[in-house]
């Protein structure tokens, strides 16, 4: 008896799934009956059509969401690759390469190198843009090269102001800064 009860339950489930299968073979617009529907004697049911539309809309949304996720992942991968390539180019410009493979240590070394370059530029610009505190007497009385009988600076006159100076002044702007890899006392 239990066996018959099980068969009856499964028979109803089979009929339900059979009707679902038949509707899945139905034409696109569902206005005419499929030959399989005619054979099994199934009639058109509006409830089934409404049921079919919802999964299609859901599956469309799911497919659209999946495509957008794939696109975002692809763009993120492309962005990461571009960043890695540009960091490698920057690292190639440095005189001593960092052998560490991680991005953070590479960027840290690049930043330290750029800071040291900026410090060197500051020191050099301060040395040539400010007037020296001490000027040797012979330099103040020097003639221009075109006025000299030799056609160039005389041997006693330096080419650059700080060349022959015994005292090089300490500039407060430069003296207060230290290279990035050194600490102040």
From Swiss-Prot:
Domain bHLH: 67-117
UniProt GO molecular function: DNA binding; DNA-binding transcription factor activity; protein dimerization activity
GO CC terms, sorted: nucleus
Source superkingdom: Eukaryota
Annotated signal sequence range: none
Main localization of the protein described in the UniProt heading: nucleus
InterPro entries: bHLH_ALC-like_plant, bHLH_dom, HLH_DNA-bd_sf
GO biological process terms on file: regulation of DNA-templated transcription; somatic embryogenesis
Subcellular location: Nucleus
Transmembrane segments: none
Purpose of the protein: Transcription factor involved in somatic embryogenesis. Acts as a positive regulator of somatic embryo formation. Acts as a positive regulator of ECP63 by targeting its promoter and inducing its expression.
Quaternary assembly: Homodimer.
PANTHER family the record matches: TRANSCRIPTION FACTOR BHLH109 (PTHR45855:SF30), TRANSCRIPTION FACTOR PIF1-RELATED (PTHR45855)
Similarity-based family: Belongs to the bHLH protein family.
Protein name: Transcription factor bHLH109
Organism encoding this protein: Arabidopsis thaliana
Gene: BHLH109
